[in-house]
């Protein structure tokens, strides 16, 4: 790891300590912050996949159950399902449940609930391309093994006490590279 990376990770640790020193935050303030972040995360995640709901519309769909005129049922379900998946991930973290291929598939199934029953929670069975990228994800027959290796490497990184930011970067990069769904 290069020196710049070490400096940045130390800065992250200092900022985390500063944030921790402010705790406990009032419960109501913490909930408002978390709710706002969840909506923004849902909006951005769905937007990059082609969902046309605005940030405000996403908040209305998720928080108020409002149906937005001119938007498809799929777009509404994508917002609702993504929020449910975030909630599930938080539950996994609180209960200290081990991340596995099964939990990853369960998260995927939540995201596609009511949208694509056939593929929800299942690795893809067809080759894919990522628009605007030169990267070609692995062929479907390679996914199972690559996901097994992905989980094994993740567990090894945890065991080695690798910095959480580096673990998160690895997880994100590998899921994008493998593109299992």
Q: Which residue stretches match the model-derived regions?
A:
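FIC/Doc superfamily catalytic core
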Residues: 1-181
């Amino acid at each position: 790891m290069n020196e710049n990376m070490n400096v940045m990770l130390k800065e992250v640790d200092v900022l985390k300590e500063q944030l921790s020193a402010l705790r406990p935050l009032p419960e109501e303030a913490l909930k408002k912050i978390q709710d706002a972040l969840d909506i923004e995360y849902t909006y951005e995640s769905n937007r990059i996949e082609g969902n046309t709901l605005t940030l405000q519309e996403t908040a209305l769909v998720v928080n108020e159950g409002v149906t937005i005129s001119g938007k498809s049922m799929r777009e509404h379900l994508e917002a609702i399902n993504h929020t449910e998946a975030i909630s599930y991930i938080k539950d996994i973290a609180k209960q200290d449940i081990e991340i596995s291929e099964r939990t990853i598939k369960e998260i995927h199934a939540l995201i596609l609930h009511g949208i694509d029953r056939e593929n929800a929670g299942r690795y893809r069975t067809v080759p894919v391309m990522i628009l605007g990228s030169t990267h070609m994800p692995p062929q479907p027959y390679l996914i199972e093994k690559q996901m097994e290796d992905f989980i094994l490497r993740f567990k090894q990184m945890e065991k080695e006490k690798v910095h959480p930011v580096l673990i998160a970067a690895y997880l994100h990069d590998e899921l994008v590279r493998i593109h299992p769904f």
